[in-house]
Amino acid sequence: AFRTSLLFSRAGGVKIVTVTSVLPREGKSATAANLAVVLAQLGRRVLLVDADLHRSRVHEVFGISNRAGLVSILAEGVEPSRVIVKTSVPGVFVVPAGPETPNPSALLSSENMRQFLALAAANFDHVVIDTPPVLATYDVLVFGQYTDGVVLCVRAGVTPRDQVREVRDKLLRGGVPILGVVLNGRKLDTDYYEYRYLNYGERAAATEDPSRESEAEAGAAS
């Protein structure tokens, strides 16, 4: 299974994984959400971080507020425990992108980002980061210093092969390991994730009062 190969593809397993795509609308946010869920099914505590500060979608997938999030942590100094949302999917927690910012790349490459991910890695078994498409921005290359590797999403019959090769080469030159490629938009005979797909935009149920539960959970973890 994909989740098993991801966990054991590197010595010591994978702690922080980045999910990206070649181009927009290739299903990366849904893939990141699915990956968080299947890792949680193994009994792990997983934090899903929406670092696509250009076109955030994770809050839509889970049907949660985007008023506060990663930008609040990085630019405003808000405590992570105040923005981490505990979803009704056991073991899955979310940090949405939060308010718009004029300079996403500067925030993602900041010392505050490094400190936040170090804190997240210390309190969760896995951290899954949804980032912008590689050919849209250079943001994903910033995560080469943070992540154990990248899962690259492509869309069947849509993503040009030459652009897939371009992205592969760009990631490897940037020192970002590629853990695997997910082909979206193709009907498979078996459940690729051993778990039904969340369609892009389909909402996973959230808790009735996620902010309160999130603060309590984060406090317990610290």
Residue map of PLM features:
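P-loop NTP-binding module
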Residues: 1-222
